């Protein structure tokens, strides 16, 4: 994206974590126009040095970051940190783009996937919520279909990378594969296993992750009438999240039209050639920004219903890239 305005002072809060590191990587790759970079983390990390574009930057505290007055702060430091600190940044006139779940369902906050609803943003939005990783990739594919055929009901099962849990989960997987004892991020082994629980269980028997997908989808797409049920599963994979998605529409569709929609939608790469065994896989989505869609076919058990397979790198489009794209939009529209 090209910018016709002055460069910006940017803070990355949670710079020492997996998503924070990925945010720095994405900012560099996309040549985000930064005049001053402020790296922020917990008190125990203050003073630590991190490299960005061959320059070393020292991690500073939250209070120091606010005093430096960046125009935008990209937050990826967990929900509690966001609840405590995002309002303080906002009160100082800093626009916060928050990757945690803290503000997503707050009625006064926008929940943004740029390809879908960035047009809703205004200068008064000082805390902007970045959606859940598994929700983002799904709604990017659902949105054009909803516009044309009107989504009635979605059944989604996810196969989610350990990177969604964080550094300790990746270390657990690698240690188990190497036969090394180490700290457990999960209650159970993850190598050679799948765990049908992501986040804690709620009173209705669903996990918080599953309910995030239900509630966030409705908010992002601006339609509370969409019915959705989800089962979210952690698998021993690094590269990204995969989803089996079954979509029932109000209106009839033609498969060739669905293929054309996926081909023409910004942010989607269609990989669907079953004769040559071409379909999305996390090992191919790894370190890419696109949402990959394939295995498109009719549900032969029910009318007006479609099956598809959706894969994306959860640390990029599912987290860091989506946040940076929001920041790019704010700059391009002169909203900061």
Where are the model-predicted features located?
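N-terminal Rossmann-like NAD(P) cofactor-binding subdomain of oxidoreductases
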Residues: 2-190, 225-227, 291-292, 296-302, ...
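Charged docking surfaces used in two-component/phosphorelay signaling
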Residues: 73, 162-336
């Amino acid at each position: 994206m090209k910018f016709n305005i002055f460069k910006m002072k940017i803070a990355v809060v949670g710079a020492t974590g997996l998503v924070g590191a990925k945010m720095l990587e994405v900012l560099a790759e996309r040549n985000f126009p930064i005049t001053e970079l402020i790296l922020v983390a917990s008190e125990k990390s203050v003073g630590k040095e991190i490299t960005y574009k061959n320059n070393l930057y020292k991690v500073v505290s939250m209070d120091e970051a606010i005093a430096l007055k960046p125009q935008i702060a990209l937050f990826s430091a967990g929900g509690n940190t966001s609840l405590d600190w995002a309002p303080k940044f906002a009160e100082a006139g800093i626009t916060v783009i928050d990757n945690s779940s803290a503000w997503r369902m707050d009625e006064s906050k926008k929940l943004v996937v740029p390809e879908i609803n960035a047009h809703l943003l205004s200068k008064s939005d000082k805390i902007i919520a970045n959606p859940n990783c598994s929700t983002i990739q799904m709604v990017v594919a659902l949105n054009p279909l909803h516009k044309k055929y009107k989504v009635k009901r979605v059944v989604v099962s996810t196969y989610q990378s350990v990177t969604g849990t964080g550094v300790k989960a990746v270390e657990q997987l690698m240690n188990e594969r190497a036969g090394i004892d180490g700290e457990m991020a999960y209650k159970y082994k993850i190598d050679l296993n799948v765990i049908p629980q992501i986040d804690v269980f709620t009173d209705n028997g669903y996990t918080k992750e599953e309910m995030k997908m239900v509630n966030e989808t409705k908010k992002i797409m601006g339609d509370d009438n969409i019915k959705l049920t989800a089962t979210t599963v952690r698998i021993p994979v690094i590269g990204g999240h995969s989803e089996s998605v079954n979509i029932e529409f109000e209106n009839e569709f033609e498969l060739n039209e669905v293929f054309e929609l996926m081909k023409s939608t910004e942010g989607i790469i269609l990989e669907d050639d079953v004769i040559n065994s071409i379909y999305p896989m996390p090992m191919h989505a790894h370190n890419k920004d696109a949402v990959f869609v394939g295995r498109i076919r009719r549900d032969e058990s029910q009318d007006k219903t479609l099956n598809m397979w959706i894969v994306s790198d959860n640390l990029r489009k599912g987290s860091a890239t989506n946040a940076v794209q929001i920041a790019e939009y704010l700059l391009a529209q002169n909203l900061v």
